[in-house]
Swiss-Prot record:
It comes from Serratia proteamaculans (strain 568). Homodimer. It is an enzyme of class 2 (transferase). The keyword Amino-acid biosynthesis applies. Transmembrane segments: none annotated. Keywords: Amino-acid biosynthesis, Branched-chain amino acid biosynthesis, Cytoplasm, Leucine biosynthesis, Manganese, Metal-binding, Transferase. This is 2-isopropylmalate synthase. Its EC number is 2.3.3.13.
């Protein structure tokens, strides 16, 4: 029977240290609740003695969480431990996590003490924490650079003092997987009371090896892994918990361990952390990046259509994603285009695949990714990007400030007509969008808005990517300008033209259907 690996999340403590602005208590609660739904065993939610705000947030979260153990950090200082206990005592179950540097470098240059003094501090602090709870974790800060003899001594002493979890951090991301796994093996071989505590690891990603080191430690016997969602944290970040969790699940053939994580909550929790922490997830991020299950190569797309396991070692549904569509680009083959048309309900006799694919390649070379409504336009009205747009932005102006409601005036050229409207909104961008909606009358709902800086300095461009919902379908738009409001307006105009083309497609489909019906009647 496989053993459990405890998942210890420190997004709200170590992860928050990477943020430019602290999270509010409300935001921390949102993340804590998401982590609880995901099934983390332990969540470290703050450093209570560090500030009144941190104390309040730890205490508030401790009251709310029922199914995960809540943990607070403390130095080997009496006040730290007492304050942590006070903040945590309202929890259903809690842990006090005390830490102390053990490497020669830290002891001599930071603590300016002897190793024997450090050993005594560790023993005294673990015993003090045990006065408040039976669940005490002791961390050997900078364990990766601690002489192994000293590390074995402090681990044995901390366990004798009452520590139930011993954490071995690679604080500066210095070790390699072979080396780090060897440290864990040595502890099991040389510490006589090691069986009385759970060995935990906490790895940083300075050399890009945090996940590799954590997996090596698990294979060597560690039964708790600490990390953060999306790998956020100081410097290069922490171990990405979602990567460790899925590695354990996918590679059951070489790791006879499991976690108690609800895997289908991984993607949603990752998105919540990303949005609330204002830290975008790189597209190529393992497990949760937007490209993690994307296939653009024609060879790969063909293989996936035949059997997803050809190029996917896990299904997107496992982490809570719905079925991921293939990205249609200039590298996509005929099979992918045909598959997408079938997904929209079209049969091959409804269109000419040869003509569609030729037109698709021309369009894909110009715009990159091709969407469903683009394919329909190519199949039924053969509209290309170089044709004049139905909607274009003539001008806009906005008035906004801290004491006035944002107001926008917008003039669009709609085919042969010029139309202008004014509207108020929650900020200048919203005001512009409200004015555009008045002009078109389209019942548009904004689903996604993303701003990305292109370049640096005063002349940097702002690229706005939006997704809107219109009559049950989603349409994409992009705008680029040095002015954010202008790029936002251009993105919406791009959306309007995509919607307009889809309307022309529907009209053409109706015309073809009526013509076919009429021909059938004449034949009869």
């Amino acid at each position: 029977m496989s053993q459990q690996v405890i998942i210890f999340d420190t997004t709200l403590r170590d992860g928050e240290q990477a943020l430019q602005a602290s999270l509010s208590v409300k935001e921390k609660i949102q993340i804590a609740m998401a982590l609880e739904r995901m099934g983390v065993d332990v969540m470290e939610v703050g450093f209570p003695v560090s500030s009144p705000g941190d104390f309040e947030s730890v205490q508030t979260i401790a009251r709310q969480i029922k199914n995960s153990r809540v943990c607070g950090l403390a130095r080997c200082v009496d006040k730290d431990i007492d304050v942590a206990a006070e903040a945590l005592r309202v929890a259903e179950a809690f842990r006090i996590h005390v830490f102390l540097a053990t490497s020669t470098l830290h002891i001599e240059s930071k603590l300016k003490r002897s190793f024997d003094e450090v050993l005594e501090m560790a023993i005294r602090s673990v015993k003090r924490a045990r006065n408040y709870t039976d669940d005490v974790e002791f961390s050997c800060e900078d364990a990766g650079r601690t002489p192994i003899d000293n590390l074995c001594r402090v681990v044995e002493a901390a366990i004798n003092a009452g520590a139930t979890t011993i954490n071995i951090p690679d604080t500066v991301g210095y070790t390699t997987p072979n080396q780090f796994g060897g440290i864990i093996t040595t502890l099991y071989d040389r510490v006589p009371n090691i069986d009385k505590a759970i060995i935990s690891v906490h790895c940083h990603d300075d050399l890009g090896m945090a996940v590799g080191n954590s997996i090596a430690a698990v294979q060597a016997g560690a039964r708790q892994v600490e990390g953060t969602l999306n790998g956020i944290g100081e410097r290069a970040g922490n171990t990405s918990l979602e990567e460790v969790i899925m590695a354990i699940k996918v590679r059951q053939d070489i790791m006879n361990v499991h976690t108690n994580i609800n895997h289908q909550e991984i993607f949603r929790t990752s998105q919540i952390v990303s949005q609330l922490c204002n830290m975008p997830i790189p597209a190529n991020k393992a497990i949760v990046g937007s490209n993690a299950f994307a296939h653009s190569s024609g060879i790969h797309q063909d293989g996936v259509l035949k059997n997803r396991e050809n190029y996917e070692i896990m299904s997107p549904q496992t982490i809570g994603l719905k079925d991921v569509q293939l990205n249609l680009t200039s590298r996509s083959g005929r099979a992918a285009v045909k598959h997408r048309m079938e997904g929209m309900g079209y049969k091959e006799q409804d269109y000419n695949l040869d003509n569609l694919y030729a037109a698709f390649l021309k369009l894909a070379d110009k715009k990159g990714q091709v969407f469903d409504y683009d394919l329909e336009a190519l199949a039924f009205i053969n509209k290309q990007q170089e044709e004049p747009e139905h909607f274009s932005l003539d001008y806009f102006s906005v008035q906004s400030g801290s004491s006035i409601m944002a107001t926008a005036s917008v003039k669009l050229i709609c085919g042969e007509e010029e139309k202008a409207e004014a509207a108020t909104g929650n900020g200048p961008v919203d005001a512009v969008y409200q004015a555009i909606n008045r002009i078109t009358g389209y019942p548009i709902e904004l689903v996604k808005y993303q701003l990305t800086a292109k370049g640096q300095g005063r002349d940097a461009l702002g690229q706005v990517d939006i997704v809107v919902s219109y009559n049950g379908r989603r349409f994409h738009g992009v705008g680029l300008a040095t002015d954010i409001v202008e790029s936002s307006a251009k993105a919406m105009v791009h959306v309007l033209n995509n919607i307009w083309r889809s309307q022309q497609v529907e009209k053409e489909k109706q015309r073809l259907q009526q013509s076919k019906h009429q021909n059938n009647q004449e034949t009869v």
